[in-house]
């Protein structure tokens, strides 16, 4: 990712950075309109996800997470920006005339070829089942399926990468980007390599307006609110929170409370919890 720095003419351009190489010019048959509603509210209109709302209108890009074009070579034609995710996407022209978007693998260049199937070489961008004999232990993978045929659901964010640790019986052991170690069926497929745009965390928006374009609203501390709005609110002047430990706006512990659903079906598949 090539970071472009502006001349220091104003405070916003002095601190802001943009990617100067990746543009957005999507194909009309691979996009569709998306009705964004809720602004972080549920069906009752109550805020369930804070600091969301506004933002620029977006067109959703149809991403091929299933990689159903088997044993047909495709060529990377463009590398484009996607407003719906941090990762870049690339347009693939397949040999049978099909055109699809996939997640951009790190290091992939325009003109490179990719293919998906059961017996394909271990090459960046190729998709194959975890049971393939050509996929050795220690392979870096992304866009991993949880359910066969449903499409990749794990390790899809910018810079995300998982590692194949072991194969035993009908399952494969993976180490996910969060540090979690879990079992997945060997029949599920994955894409070789790491997701591109690794340096997205190093990018500086430079000003508050750029944050609002992304649909992110300001974050307000609970201690400066009124008691009706937050358990930390109220008091004369700069008062302490008045509790032993910080809490959420709904009174639950804010630091270190487990939010995973109890007795979930996949508990038996997780060998080690994610690292904090």
From Swiss-Prot:
PROSITE patterns: RIBOSOMAL_L2 (PS00467)
Signal peptide as annotated in the record: none
Keyword NAD appears in the UniProt entry: no
Subcellular location: Plastid, Chloroplast
InterPro entries on file: NA-bd_OB-fold, Rib_uL2_dom2, Ribosomal_uL2, Ribosomal_uL2_bac/org-type, Ribosomal_uL2_C, Ribosomal_uL2_CS, Ribosomal_uL2_dom3, Ribosomal_uL2_RNA-bd_dom
Lineage: superkingdom: Eukaryota
GO MF assignments: rRNA binding; structural constituent of ribosome; transferase activity
Coiled coil feature spans: none
Biological processes annotated in GO: mitochondrial translation
Keywords attached to this entry: Chloroplast, Plastid, Ribonucleoprotein, Ribosomal protein
Similarity-based family: Belongs to the universal ribosomal protein uL2 family.
PANTHER family: LARGE RIBOSOMAL SUBUNIT PROTEIN UL2M (PTHR13691:SF5), RIBOSOMAL PROTEIN L2 (PTHR13691)
Protein name: Large ribosomal subunit protein uL2cy
Taxonomic placement: Eukaryota, Viridiplantae, Streptophyta, Embryophyta, Tracheophyta
């Amino acid at each position: 990712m090539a970071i472009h720095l502006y001349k220091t003419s104003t405070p916003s351009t002095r601190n802001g950075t943009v990617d100067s190489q990746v543009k957005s010019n999507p194909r009309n048959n691979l996009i569709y309109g998306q009705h964004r509603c809720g602004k972080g509210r549920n069906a009752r209109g109550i805020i369930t996800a804070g600091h969301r709302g506004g933002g620029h209108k977006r067109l959703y890009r149809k991403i091929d997470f299933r990689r159903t074009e088997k044993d047909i070579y495709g060529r990377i034609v463009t590398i484009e920006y996607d407003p719906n995710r941090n990762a870049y996407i690339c347009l693939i022209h397949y040999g049978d005339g099909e055109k699809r978007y996939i997640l951009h693998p790190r290091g992939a260049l325009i003109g490179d070829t990719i293919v998906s199937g059961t017996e394909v070489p271990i090459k960046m961008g190729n998709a194959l089942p975890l049971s393939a004999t050509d996929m050795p232990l220690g392979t870096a993978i992304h866009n991993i399926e949880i359910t066969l045929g449903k499409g990749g659901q794990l390790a899809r964010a910018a810079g995300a990468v998982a590692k194949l640790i072991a194969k035993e019986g009908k399952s494969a052991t993976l180490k996910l980007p969060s540090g979690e170690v879990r079992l997945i069926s060997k029949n599920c497929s994955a894409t070789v390599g790491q997701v591109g745009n690794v340096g997205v965390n190093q990018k500086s928006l430079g000003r508050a307006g750029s944050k609002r374009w992304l649909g992110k609203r300001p974050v307000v501390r609970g201690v400066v609110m009124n008691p009706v709005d937050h358990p930390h609110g109220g008091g004369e002047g700069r008062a302490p929170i008045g509790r032993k430990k910080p809490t959420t706006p709904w009174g639950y512990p804010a630091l270190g409370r487990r939010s995973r659903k109890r007795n979930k079906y996949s508990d038996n598949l997780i060998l080690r919890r994610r690292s904090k």
